[in-house]
Amino acid sequence: MATVPVYCICRLPYDVTQFMIECDACKDWFHGSCVGVDEDDAPDIDIYHCPNCEKTHGKSTLKKKKNWSKHDTGQSTDIKAVQNGSQVFIKELRSRTFPSADDVVVKLSGSQLTMDYLEENGFNEPILAQKKDGLGLSMPAPTFYISDVENYVGPDVGVDVVDVTKQTDSKMKLKEFVDYYYSTNRKKVLNVINLEFSDTRMNSIVESPQIVRRLSWVENYWPDDALLGKPKVTKYCLICVKDSYTDFHIECGGASVWYHVLKGEKIFFLIKPTSANLSLYERWRSSSNHSEMFFADQVDKCYKCTLKQGQTLFIPSGWINAILTPVDCLAFSGHFVHNLSVEMQMRAYEIEKRLKVKTLTPFPNFETACWYVGRHLLERFKGLHKANKQPAPYLIHGAKIINGAFRAWTKKQALLEHEDELPENMKPSQLIKDLAKEIRLSENATKAIKSEPSIKVPVEEPPSTHSEPEEPVSPAHVPSPSREKARKKASKPPKPPKPPKPPKMPKAPKPPKVPKVKEGGKKKAKKVKESSPPPKPSSFAALESHAKDILSKMDQPKKTKAVKNVLSMSEKEISKQNNLEKFEIREQNKNKTEAKWKYKNSKPDSLLKMEEECKFDRTLLSGNKDKFSFTMSHKKMLGSKTLKPQTNSSVFGSLQNLKEDKTKPVRDEYEYVSDEGELKIDEFPIRRKKNTVKRDQSFLSDIREPIQPAKKPKFQPLVTKNVDSSDEETLHIDTEAKPEVKSRNSKVKKKGGSAAGILDLLQASKQVGGIDYSTNSQPPASPSTQEAIQGMLSMANLSSSDSLQQPWSNSQSKNNSQSKSNSHGAQGGKKGSGGGGNNSKRPTKRLPKKPRKSSSIESLDYDDDQDHMDACFKDSDYVYPSLESEEDNPVFKSRSKKRKSSDDTPYSPTARVGPSVPRQERPARDGARVASIETGLAAAAAKLSHQEEQQKTKKKKKSTKKKAIVIEEPPKISQDSSSPEHNLDSQDGSLTDHEFNTGTVKSPGGPQPMAPGVFLSQRRPSMSSPNNSTNSTSTNSSSMAKGDRVGSADAKAKRLKKGMATAKQRLGKILKIHRNGKLLL
């Protein structure tokens, strides 16, 4: 029976859980615990000899250290940087001199460190307490030592141990570390800094300072029944041996920290958290070799503070600190976040998130603590307001910072990252809204109280960078007349400084100051805009043009109302002797204002805008064009935030819209519109950026109707354009306006009810568009080809009646007089377009509801078109259809998106509406051939519907080939597979699409077109319809080449390809290519 091998001096079998080392002499294996070799020390041993071999071979030899840096790659010390924490580093650090911390550290007794002191002086500098008396701090007896820690916490508790020399950490049981601590031969410098004992027996004998317990968010605001447990950061035990060093760091979560030295001594190196120092710290910490750079060398000042036995040090949030232990030390500490340094805590937290640094003392669920604090602050603010009290300024500022962070964390793109720390049963959006409202109330009341003692002009502080646009002040929340009186008094002092402000008008940093007071502030801003002198003539045109582009309809009523208020209230506000009288009037009207506020906030925004526009219609402005334009433009540029206190809870979205409006470019032209015989400047620009907010569009579409009837003849002199001036002068290609067609169409739908439908719009479009439109056609196809097309149509189940050809005939005769000029205009539009090709797809988009209207009706309407012109909205850029023509054609909308990038499509500004009939003379484009497509389609249709006509078609093929040399037509292939398939692909889209839309078929007598834009009798390369200019161009060129190839090999190409034997198979293949179910041209 085989025996189990045994090892080591203890002669025990191999144990996988124990570390073993091999002797280089006897080749036996020994347990590290038996021969006194630690696992961490083994890599440093070069040749190992067991205790038995040491007698004959000598002691074990260690590897030679080339450098104190942990990168011991054999380089000399003068080349390699010194590693932070190494023996060389500690020796040099001890010998250096630093500025004394007496300049920055505040020394207080325990009784002086109170909540009132911190609220009055803040907690921005370190505080040192010489004794623990009065701090409310509980500590063990001075005889308490490391072995007692082991007894209270437990010997088997795992702790993170930092190897100071290498600045690395490893796991170790507390019992093993205590053994190391008491050993006389310490081969390494080990440090324990994160032994958190709040859930152990030692928790009862250590109590944090009372001021910390009063400030701590975790202690006060974290619910006991929360699903997420409280962060365990309040009580740490620090066991540090001599020469322990912790490199520069900021506490996690921007937490403040307190230290109390029970035994020994600690030296703190402190750096102020200025913006420059924080930026330097972030750069240093993110570098790969930061462990070889002493951070204190990069900043202007690093203070040295020695904390001796029995002393307590409080380090504020954000301070960058490093810690050196000159002698063995036992200390206690704890981290806490609080309301006094919310801004710095958030900043430090953001730095921590960006650095993604792994730390031994994290602050878990920091964002969850913030949510609980936000809920607490909301309840606290509400209670204070009900008791006619105001929160402390640091609370208001902290609430604004927290609310801003809430908004950032709940954004759509950031929600996934932050939703794990969102507390249960918390409604973030409601909390943000309510907290913003309470902040606004507190800010306004606080500013009013500050300005109450003196009537002098108060110095307005610039708004905080973290401040958010808040909710409007509701009079219902104003608790007492005293606050109201204070607010009115605060509204008066800002009046005198109006004269010095106008020179700063072109700048935009002033608006945030305006909402200082609810009503008075608004009037002040409005009056400033009204009374300011006009700018230089050189900048006036730019200002006026800029105003036209950025003013939207939702703002115009408010601006006009603002001017009206200024004119009506100016005398009151100039005199300073009416304070009491004004106050009494406002007190009497308080209920009215309250009801009006509630009424406004209970209604949708659109209703409020429409009501204000009715007031705008009744408002008469005294002043000339210059004054009006200047006021309106500056109202937008300088007073955008002034308008906001009037709005309801959607103030955040509205402010965002205003911000986007400000970035729009200055228009280089004015837009004019004609309405009911009167002319006025169109204050609502037609072209808009693509990033226009949808909410803006809905406002415009809802409000356009009441504003449109212009009843103020005072605006008439502003117009410089003639009624009879040609609309051609204002035509321009605007590719950016295409996404806006739908929203503008919706406006016209509401006011186009009096029009006679799409026919009147078609007639109107011809006049709006000028002479740039062509509706003429060309001679139709031959009768034999017509029969082939009829066969194809019957196979595709497309109905066709003879009467449907009449529109083409009538429009042919009707437009003969304009054929030459129109065709030239179309050519110019095609060649001058480029990127505007998708506009030429509009004819088929606008016409699907009009397939069966005869041209006799159209002719009668054409004679009466002048009667309908006044009821139709006419625009130089767009012509809008009536209500029924926009809804049933999703396929065309998707098609227009696909072809936006075409570079060679023809373009005409008026090609959106009008009958889709053939054009006469159009220029040929290289490589665009249609004849092969026509013959292939005709052949496939003929074989399907008339089998007996196949022989006739084959007989004609020879004569067709002879003619091809003269007229440049590729040979006609009836049964070969390559060319007909590609021809069918691009051609029957034209056929079927126009059958659905215009219904043009043959009529007896004379050559007829097989489909609009396709004629077999005249061989022209450019025969493709505007709807398929991109696809047909590429397909025709390929089919031309293929047709030539197949024509040359006609003798041996009698055999058909698989799946192409019959026209039905070929047609099925074509239909599969067009996956949207339509045959598109």
UniProtKB/Swiss-Prot annotation:
Low complexity biased stretches: 809-823, 1021-1040
First-level EC class: oxidoreductase
- Zinc-finger (PHD-type) residue ranges come to 5-56
For the ligand (Fe cation), the binding residues are: H249, E251, N321
Instruction: Provide an example Pfam family for this protein.
Output: JmjC
EC number(s) on file: 1.14.11.-
Q: Tell me the protein family, please.
A: Belongs to the JHDM1 histone demethylase family. JHDM1D subfamily.
- Quote the record's binding site residues for 2-oxoglutarate: T246, Y259, K266
PROSITE patterns attached here? JMJC, ZF_PHD_1, ZF_PHD_2
Domain JmjC, first and last residues per copy: 197-353
What would you give as a GO molecular function for this chain, any one? zinc ion binding
Which residues are recorded as modified (Phosphoserine)?
S1022
- GN (gene name): phf2
Q: Where is this region: Disordered?
A: 450-560, 722-756, 770-1062
InterPro entries hit by this protein: JHD (IPR041070), JHDM1_Histone_Demethylase (IPR050690), JmjC_dom (IPR003347), Zinc_finger_PHD-type_CS (IPR019786), Znf_FYVE_PHD (IPR011011), Znf_PHD (IPR001965), Znf_PHD-finger (IPR019787), Znf_RING/FYVE/PHD (IPR013083)
Compositional bias segments (type: Basic and acidic residues): 545-558, 729-743, 868-877, 919-928, 1042-1053
Question: Can you say what this protein is called?
Answer: Lysine-specific demethylase phf2
> Where located?
Nucleus, Nucleolus; Chromosome, Centromere, Kinetochore
